[in-house]
Each structure stands twice: as structure tokens, then as C-alpha cells.
Amino acid sequence: MVSATPPAPADGRRVALLTLGCARNEVDSEELAARLHSDGWQVTTDGEGADVVVVNTCGFVEKAKQDSIQTLLAAAETGAKVVAAGCMAERYGRELAESLPEAQAVLSFDDYPDISDRLGAVLAGTAIDAHTPRDRRELLPLTPVRRGEAAVSLPGHGTPAAVAQPGARSAPIEVDEHTPAHLRPVLRRRLDTGPVASLKLASGCDRRCAFCAIPAFRGAFVSRPPEALLAEAEWLARTGVRELVLVSENSSSYGKDLGDPRALEKLLPQLAAVDGIVRVRASYLQPAETRPGLVEAIATTPGVAPYFDLSFQHSSEAVLRRMRRFGSTDRFLELLGSIRALSPEAGARSNFIVGFPGETRADVAELVRFLEEARLDAIGVFDYSDEDGTEAAGLSGKVTTATVKRRYDRLSALADELCAQRAEQRLGSTVQVLVDSVDGGVVEGRAAHQAPEVDGSTTLVAPVGGGVDLTALRPGDLVECTVTATEGVDLVAVPDAMISAAPGVAR
């Protein structure tokens, strides 16, 4: 088995990678870890004792930006050199550098191929000029199928050929004589030893949602080749990963720039067939692009979780039009109905924005109707706020702050109630639970409808009589269980049978 955490060089410079935001950022950090480790750096996720702390920031909404700034300031208090990377750094560049002198450098995605040189310069006291932000959509051809030819840094795309700029050093993962040739280009070093890992399908987005700034700093949509994804999936499995979570800004678009708009339907069974992988989970699906064939592939392919992370954002047709999105309550309910016709117990989650400019009480009532009929397992509610550089910031019909808060509080309370009710509907059902952790006799895992960190979890309790010995379970085991109780969105279940034991684990 390839080690997830190969020993660090004894005399290496020490760098801490702190990751904020989404799972896509986590993949980017693991690419940086691979580059740095191969160049002699000791890589850690603990800022204490580090020579340099790199904060992979999030810049999606105001709260995320504030969290990023606070993390950078806290890192500076350790006495280490501090470097800002990631989305907030890319989005604000020179402006962030001027407003945050505590950071010795603010890096662009274009700096990633030379990350070791950049951090070396920081340690040497050399000033690094921050970049002037630009719309990264303009760096790639307008025609999707020509984007693979462009020499643009795409974080998390996993192979030196995909991300290295002319003259930049490529930095593959540590390999040995037992590493198959097709795995040697994988550019990733795990920072987590758990049984689940994200696999980045693509970067960027071609949609123009009025509230979202992501395409401007992440760029246009670019898919990774299937062969690169399959190689990385195999490499991850060799490090002990059992579940792959497919991430991107819009997974439904995967393959459109490869000349195959149905590429995801073909990729899913191939990923599920990778030795050692017991669950593949798709995420970040765009409802308008979630076609019948994709629904069928996710709902019925063995080894693929029947799980639908659908970005609805609202259900009022009028609000969706102002958001530059498509859909309505009835169309979204029809989509959910088609999913459950194929997989009655399929999981479904979504996020919603309340208080978008022009939203009326009737629009809120329409959203409430949708939520009450949709039977979603997890619901995220966000209160609207203007974001720099977005179309929505200039729209008329702004909802007052007090009204936004009232609507947010109401919808959040409703979401909690509805998700708890949905969990109760699973009482007595059989679920497949992947064990994530065993700590002091407490065994935690997730059923197929529960994605890591965002959708709740399942606690396993000792069976009465037969079943699986709870004390013998280990992270990475896949167990068939019966749901016996709920706690909000979380489940309590009894393990009935081992489906697939984690390989190479002492028992």
C-alpha cells in the first residue's frame, strides 16, 4: 500500500497548510503538499512550530472572508511567516496584501507550480509582489473543447502536465519501485488519513448566476481527463480511501469540454470498479443539467451512492430568473420524483438563499411549499448579502436587513424541523454505513444519504444477540445496519452484517 503520510525529510523546512472552505480547497492543499514535500519541506496541518504557515483561504461570502482573515492573523501570532493562498487571495490579490501586512505574501493560483520557490523566498525575506486580480475566464478559450490546450494553472488537477507552467518544476508524489507507472504522475499527498477523500472532477464554472463571483476567480469550466481521475482514484484507494466524493463547481457539466456531455455517466461505474473503493458520491449537481441518464446512473449504479446534492438555491420561478437560473417548485419536485422512482431511499440535499433582491412574501411562500413537499435530507439556508463584482449587487429591489434576518430565521427553523422529520422516516430501514471513526468505543459513520461534514452522521450501537461485534469495527468498514433511533438529522443504527471490511487493518 502506498503510504498516505511518507516520512518527512529530517532536515526539511517546516510548512503548515491550513485549509478553509470547501472540499475543492482541500484537494488543492494536497496538491501543494505534494509539491512541497517532494522539494524537501516538512508538511503539516499544525501551525505550531512551522517556519511558514500557508492559509488556503475561502472567498465565497463575507463570513468566509472574515474567517480567512482571522485565521491569517492567528497564524501571524505564532511567529511564523504567513502566506495567503486560495480563493480569497486570488480574488483580491494586491488589495488583500495592502490591507493585511501580517501576511508576508499573497499568492495567485499561477504561483502554485512554483510554490516551493515562493515559500523559500518568503523565508529568505524576499518581497513577493502580489498580483493584480483578473477575470480568470478570460485566460481560457471561449470554446470549451479548446480549453485543454491552454497553459493555465488549474489547482487540484493532479498531474504535472496539467498544471505546470513553462519553466516550472513539476513535483510528483513520492513513489517507489512498487508504484505502477500510471500512478507516478499523480500530484497529491494526503493530509488526512481517514477513509474518505475528495476527487476533483473539474475546475471553474460557465454559468452566470447573478449572486456568484466564483467564475471570475476560478475561471471557466475545465474537466480533468477520465484517465487522470481513474489513476488518482486508484492511488487514493492504495492510501486507504474507501469512499470518493466527486467535487467541482458544477459536476453535471463534466465532460462537455472533452466532447462528451455524458462523460460522468460513463465515469461513475469505472470509479466504482476501482479496487478498494466501496462508495462513489457525486456532489455539486446543477438541477438544470441533471439529465435523466445521469439520474439513472447515480440512482442505480452499484457502488455509487444514490445521493443527489442539487443546487436549487430557490424554488420561486421569478426569483430564479433574477438569479439567472432556471426551474420552479413543480419542476424541482418532478426531478425529485424521477429520482425516487428509481431509488425510493435516495438521499437529497440542497442549499437555498433567502432575501435575494426582489424576493417577495409570495416567493417565500413558494419556497416553503417546496421545502415541505421535497423531503430533503439536508437543507442549508443562507441569508443574501451583496458580493463584490456580482450582478446581484447592482440589482434593484433590495430586501431590508431586518426582513432578510426574519426570513432566514424562519426558513432555518423550518429546515431543521423538516430534516429531522425526514430522518425519522428512515426508522427501521436498512442502511449501508461506512465507518469513519472509532474513538473510545464510539463508532461513527455515514449512510449513503450522508455526505462528509454537511449531512449528519450515523452512530452505531451494540446489537442485542447476533449481528456484528461493535468492538471489531474499524474505519473503512462498510456495514449493513438497521436504523433504530434518530437525533435531529443524525441516525442511530445497529450493525447487522459486514459488507466489506477495510483491507490491511489489524483486528
Swiss-Prot record:
**Entries under PANTHER family matching the protein:** RIBOSOMAL PROTEIN S12 METHYLTHIOTRANSFERASE RIMO, RIBOSOMAL PROTEIN US12 METHYLTHIOTRANSFERASE RIMO
Q: Which Pfam families match?
A: Radical_SAM (PF04055), TRAM_2 (PF18693), UPF0004 (PF00919)
Give the catalytic activity. L-aspartate(89)-[ribosomal protein uS12]-hydrogen + (sulfur carrier)-SH + AH2 + 2 S-adenosyl-L-methionine = 3-methylsulfanyl-L-aspartate(89)-[ribosomal protein uS12]-hydrogen + (sulfur carrier)-H + 5'-deoxyadenosine + L-methionine + A + S-adenosyl-L-homocysteine + 2 H(+)
Give the Enzyme Commission number: 2.8.4.4
| Span of domain TRAM | 424-497
Its annotated function is as follows: Catalyzes the methylthiolation of an aspartic acid residue of ribosomal protein uS12.
Q: Which residues bind [4Fe-4S] cluster 1?
A: 22, 58, 87
Note describing how the cofactor binds: Binds 2 [4Fe-4S] clusters. One cluster is coordinated with 3 cysteines and an exchangeable S-adenosyl-L-methionine.
Positions binding [4Fe-4S] cluster 2 in this chain are 205, 209, 212
Alphabetically list the UniProt keywords.
4Fe-4S, Cytoplasm, Iron, Iron-sulfur, Metal-binding, S-adenosyl-L-methionine, Transferase
Q: What is this protein called?
A: Ribosomal protein uS12 methylthiotransferase RimO
* MTTase N-terminal domain sequence ranges: 13-124
Species lineage: Bacteria, Bacillati, Actinomycetota, Actinomycetes, Micromonosporales
HAMAP family noted in UniProt: MTTase_RimO (MF_01865)
- Extract one GO cellular component term from the record: cytosol
Its family remark reads: Belongs to the methylthiotransferase family. RimO subfamily.
Radical SAM core domain span: 191-422
**Broad class of enzyme this protein falls into:** transferase
Annotated GO MF terms: 4 iron, 4 sulfur cluster binding; aspartic acid methylthiotransferase activity; metal ion binding; protein methylthiotransferase activity
Q: Where in the cell is it found?
A: Cytoplasm
The record, for InterPro entries, names: Elp3/MiaA/NifB-like_rSAM, Methylthiotransferase_CS, Methylthiotransferase_N, Methylthiotransferase_N_sf, NA-bd_OB-fold, Ribosomal_uS12_MeSTrfase_RimO, rSAM, rSAM_horseshoe
Q: What are the names of the required cofactors? A: [4Fe-4S] cluster
Q: Which domain of life is it from?
A: Bacteria
